[in-house]
Structures are given as C-alpha cells and as structure tokens.
From Swiss-Prot:
Biased composition (Basic residues): 598-620
UniProt protein name: Dual specificity tyrosine-phosphorylation-regulated kinase 1A
Gene Ontology MF terms: actin binding; ATP binding; cytoskeletal protein binding; histone H3T45 kinase activity; identical protein binding; non-membrane spanning protein tyrosine kinase activity; protein kinase activity; protein serine kinase activity
Task performed by this protein: Dual-specificity kinase which possesses both serine/threonine and tyrosine kinase activities. Plays an important role in double-strand breaks (DSBs) repair following DNA damage. Mechanistically, phosphorylates RNF169 and increases its ability to block accumulation of TP53BP1 at the DSB sites thereby promoting homologous recombination repair (HRR).
Outcome when changing Y321F: Mildly reduces kinase activity. Does not abolish autophosphorylation on tyrosine residues
Recorded name of the encoding gene: DYRK1A
Entry's localization field: Nucleus; Nucleus speckle
Native species: Homo sapiens (Human)
Entry-annotated residues carrying Phosphothreonine: T402
Amino acid sequence: MHTGGETSACKPSSVRLAPSFSFHAAGLQMAGQMPHSHQYSDRRQPNISDQQVSALSYSDQIQQPLTNQVMPDIVMLQRRMPQTFRDPATAPLRKLSVDLIKTYKHINEVYYAKKKRRHQQGQGDDSSHKKERKVYNDGYDDDNYDYIVKNGEKWMDRYEIDSLIGKGSFGQVVKAYDRVEQEWVAIKIIKNKKAFLNQAQIEVRLLELMNKHDTEMKYYIVHLKRHFMFRNHLCLVFEMLSYNLYDLLRNTNFRGVSLNLTRKFAQQMCTALLFLATPELSIIHCDLKPENILLCNPKRSAIKIVDFGSSCQLGQRIYQYIQSRFYRSPEVLLGMPYDLAIDMWSLGCILVEMHTGEPLFSGANEVDQMNKIVEVLGIPPAHILDQAPKARKFFEKLPDGTWNLKKTKDGKREYKPPGTRKLHNILGVETGGPGGRRAGESGHTVADYLKFKDLILRMLDYDPKTRIQPYYALQHSFFKKTADEGTNTSNSVSTSPAMEQSQSSGTTSSTSSSSGGSSGTSNSGRARSDPTHQHRHSGGHFTAAVQAMDCETHSPQVRQQFPAPLGWSGTEAPTQVTVETHPVQETTFHVAPQQNALHHHHGNSSHHHHHHHHHHHHHGQQALGNRTRPRVYNSPTNSSSTQDSMEVGHSHHSMTSLSSSTTSSSTSSSSTGNQGNQAYQNRPVAANTLDFGQNGAMDVNLTVYSNPRQETGIAGHPTYQFSANTGPAHYMTEGHLTMRQGADREESPMTGVCVQQSPVASS
C-alpha cells in the first residue's frame, strides 16, 4: 500500500508520464469519446475503468495501484489536447510575422468589401427617395437646375435634339436640327434658376443689339437666330461654328500659325472691336481669348467672336473680376475702372500666342500674372499706380515716389528684371521667328516682324487712354501692302466670311451638317482654359481641307473717293482710311487726324501681354501635350467628341459664362476721355452713312443702353459736341460694303497644319 507521500507525488503538477506513455495513443482515441467536462463525478468511473483495462494490456498489469490514481490526471490532459492540428499557415505567429503583408491585405479586403456593400445597400435604400427628392420642374430638371437632355427628343415640333455638346456653369449646349430652317443649330439651354436667367437675358439683349446693327453678319459676331422659353428654361439658338483658335493652336503642337494667318485673324478681330465700339453699342466683351474665337468653316480663316455671357456696355459694368487671367488687362488687375480698351489688351495677348504657340503671360495667379507682365513691359507708369486701388498688392512705393515690385511671399518664383524679357526676342524678330521656325519663309522677314512687334506694343500699352484703338490699329503698317503681296491681307478676298459660308451652303450652319455621334466629355482643369466653348465636331485629320483655308485672294476693287467731311477742327484735312480685312468688307472712313493716338508709342520698349484661361484642361492627343487653361470664375467647360468626318459642327459657345460669385457693381466709367479714345468709342461702322448732329447723337432712337458714356456725362468723357458753326460730321463707309467674288488664289498659310480636334476638358 502506498504512503501519503507517494500519493502526493502523483499530483498533476508532478506526475511522471514516462512510465505510462506506452498507452498514450490509446488514450487519445478514448479521449475523443469522453465528455468534455471539467467536473469530475462518479459517472465517469466506468470509463476510467475501461481505460485502466486498456492500459493494463500494455503494461502487463504492472503497478496497478499507481495507475488507478494517475489515470484521472492523464485523461484531463488528454482532453486539453486538440483533436486535430491546424494548418501551420493559420498560426497567429506566422500571420503576424512571415505573412504580415498578406494579413494586412486580407484585413483591407474584408473591411472595404463590407464598406462597399453597405454603401451599395444605402444607395439602394434611397434610390427611390433620391429620384423623388432631386428631380425638379415636373421631372424635366436634375438637382443642378439643368434640363435633362434626351437625345432624339423633339421640341415644339421644330427642333430635333441630336446630342449634348457642352456643359458649363450657365447650363448646357445641345446640337439640334431645325426642321423649319432645315439646318443644324446650337441651342444654349440656360439653367432654371433666377440668377442665370437674369444674366442670360443681358446676353440676349446685347446679342440682339449687335445683330440688329450687323444684319449682313459682316463684323465677325456670332449670330443669335432666336430665343425662346421651353419648360422654364431660356434657350438661345445660335448658328453652328467650327474649331476655336485654341484647337487650332493645339493642333500645331503649340508651335503657332504663320504670320500671314495671324495677320488675317488680327484684321478681323480689329474690325469686330471697331464694330463693338460704335456709340450705339459701346460693348465690352470682357473675355476675349482663343477659346472664344471660332472659325466659321474649318477650310477658311474667317472667324467669329462668341460668348458674350460676361459682356456689358460702357457705363453698365457690373463685374470687377473679369477676363481670363492670361488676357487680363493691367487696369483690371489693379482694380481700376475699365472700358473697351481691355479688349484691345486681350487681343494683343492673343495675337502673340497665335504666332508663338504659347501664352505671353501665363500667370498662375494674379501676382504671378502681374510679375510676368512686368518682365516684358517694365513697371507701370507711376500716374497709373498712384490711382490704382490694388497697386500695393503687386508693388511698393518708395520714398522718392517711384514704385518697385513687391517680393513674392513664397520666394520660389524668380523673375527677370523689369522690362528685360524683350518682345523682340519672344517673337524672334531677327532670329527667324519664334524658335527660329520661320527662317526663310515668305512673309516672315525682319521688316514683317518689326511691324508686327510695333502693333503688339501699341496694343499692350499700360495706359488705356493711349492704348491703340481698333480704328488706328486697322491703319497700321502691319496691314498695309508690301513688296511681298503674300504677306498681308490687302489683296485678300474681301467677301464677308459669314456671307461666304452662307452663300456656299445656303445656311450659316452648313459646317455642322455632317456632325454626328455622341458627345464626349473629358476633364480640363482651362482651362480650359479655363477655363473653357462647347463644340462638337466630326474632325479627324483634315490635311487636305486646311490647304484650302483662306486661299482666295482678290485684287482690291477701285473705290469711290468720298469728299472731305465737314466739321473737323483744325486746318489739317481729314485722313481717308481704307480698311481691308480678310475676308472682310472694304470700308472707307473719313476721320479727323488724331496724332496722339495714331503716332504714340508705348514708353516701355516692350509691352506686356497677359493671358487668363477658364478652368478647363485641354487634353492633347499623343504628342500634343496638355495645357492648363485656368478660368476666371466657375466657368463652363468644354466638351467635344471626335468623329471620322472632316467637317466640324461647332457650337458658338466658349462657355466662359456666368460668374459664380457676383462682385460689387461698378457703374462709373473710367477716365478715358482723350481725343484718341473719343475716336475709338465713337467710330460708327454701318452699312450706310451715319450722320451726327451737334449733340453727337445719330438720327435714330437710341435706347437707354446706347452710348452710355454720353448719357452718364462722366468727367473725362467727351459728349461729341461740334462747333455751332459747322455742319454735321460724317463718318462714312462705302454704302452697303460691297461683296465681291474673285478667282485669284494664294497659297494657304494653313498648308501643312493638320487640324484635329481632340477632347477638351470639362468639369
């Protein structure tokens, strides 16, 4: 019999298993059949007895008394052992060491799968409520106040909606077929919201006013055919146009177009600005940029200005934050009153960009913009900065009264000293053009470049009072005949491009007749620029087509010489000016000599050009590259779709429309009342002779918007009073500016330019 000490030695903490391991395997099998309980009871004794019997068979029934006491402890240990061993790969130690990355991936998969499932379930739960909550205007609008466009829908039994070709902050643009006129049109659908409606009504009024004074569509302004309300949306019906000038630039890989083609664009734009400056219009576009200048036809150089959504009349200005940044004039940057001269600044910037392929002043913000202007043009005159509310945003005044640039806060951008980045070098006047790419080309001589540079410097005059005006720009030697007839436009076709298009196709939207396919949108940060025209086109590479662009030329027609008008002060006879644009109508103006405006030259050796884009990125294709076009406000963006056909159906919209934030209204005109600007603002351009009485008013009923500068009577703005002893002065044009056809042709400056419209950004 064992003693108590021996019994104590057999406790679980000190049991010796070696003698009994011979039956351990049998114990495992038996343990699998035993109840898993941590309480010991007499009910388990029979099982223990069975184990003992099994164990005795292995130990020859030796030490039976000891086994009787050890067996309960062995069974307990066996119960704690796993019945089956797990895969080593699932061991926690392995998961947290060798397979740690795999563990993290699994956690992410499980987590995000659950999150995605919950999100989908949540969407499913409120999908029905969402429709009920966000569909407005009896189900015709979405939650953004935009009309829900349905392809193939027919409006008013007249317009068949083809597709959405553009979308912006103002609303949308669709391509539609007009069954009545049997032509393609672009319909601008304004958002169903009061603020957008009000602004669009201003645009409609200005467009109708311009179209009223340009019934023959001679002056390069987009034609508003009609407008109507449809399901609470104001809809503007425009002619269809083609590519914009930014598309053209992009398709030259941003190398720029020839000086010849740049000249043709310049003449048409100056003519358009001259038209806008007529007293009964006095319209400031406020957002000129390449995106807002569209080709009428992809085969011709005729252009039109679009997007008057930001425009205003002189004296009716409502915005202070205007113009795309790259093209923003100094007076706008400095917070000064502005007038029509801001559009001339923008034009100067555009023309340089069209030839060089790159923006002259591509500022990332207003401070950067001003610094880049100063690099080229130097510090603005002190008399301007002294009056500028925002001068100290960019400059600091020294004790001696002079101004210097402020150092940038970040200190990252380093600029060239003021006025040291010469326009002479930017244009490559003596080095074969930009990058030397025009060396040896006809029409790109040093003399040609010197004329171009001089015109640009006059357009980029810091002082809006002395900045060249459209009338005098058209007289510049850059547009005059030279020994090389191919370098200017004076012998180019004088037929109105809009009329040519209409005559050749029967409609003003013929270029869009073959446009088809669905519209595409892609993201432009704008640009596109910004920043921002809605167009749709069917335009693959059309190398053959561009060779035909702008190729017609005609010998100038002998024009009647008008007698000198009465009423000019001074002894000098009035200057007779022949204005020829390609393919614009020839116009003879009789004007008083304005020496200060005609012969002035900017004090700085190089003038500044700045350029602001709508926020919209243009995505170039392949080697074309991308260029961001920042936009001045929450502007519409561009969208396009590319098809295989060559022709282009292009909406007239550049889609830089409404400002998302209304700035303080400014109704006071800037002080621009010098003799030169008087001629600028009041140079009538009409089909018939315009007669002015002593009060300067035409023999027509002027509306409240006509000649607002005269009505406001602001100091510094002459009211066109003529001496009482003189007769009425006549601004004369050739009656109904003749339209001519010709057969002579010159080589197209577009030869070799492969124009392909790639998707433009939309946001």
